[in-house]
Amino acid sequence: MDLENNTLPGRSKMMTAIRCFANKIRSFYMLNIRYSGVYWGGVRTLVRVPLSTSIWSPHKDVTVGDRVQFGPHCRIQCDIKFGNSILMAADVAFVGKDDHITNIAGKTIWNSGRGDSQKTFVGNDVWIGHGAIIIAGVKIGDGAIVAAGSVVTKDVEPCTIVGGNPAKFIKNRFETLEEKEKHLQYLKMLYP
């Protein structure tokens, strides 16, 4: 770690080194002990997982790429694949779409069982705002931004900003198509 460039004003290099070490211990616990069934991307993986994060997958199919940061109290309750360079704020939830079968006459919801859960995909360079809810089975494209409090029920196009309930297109992340293409090419080069 480059302590020279990662030290905040007023914080000593020693405190930054101690925080970095504590972060590595917490991440080791979360990645190797608490969620040992999750595939964490590889040898050079930098993943930040607070202790308050909860991961449960119906088919134990969770993959997390490199440079992924979960905010406090994030909930993952579906099969999912995370790309690389993802930021998630606090209270982000990935929830199952077909958790309970509700349309069988003569059976209670309790006795009807569960439906098939679809896999969710989160691309590279994605930012998901505070309290967003992502319904299982959607694909969030590379470079997308999901606004705080959004409920994402449909796929999110690459390099777009969505928000609301249900989430709708707000605007493009980049002003021109050339900028968008340049960024997507950069991501393809960075994460082949």
Enumerate the predicted regions with their spans:
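Short conserved AdoMet
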Residues: 87, 139, 157
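Flexible glycine-rich beta->alpha loop in the catalytic core of nucleotide-sugar glycosyltransferases
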Residues: 99-100, 150-151, 157
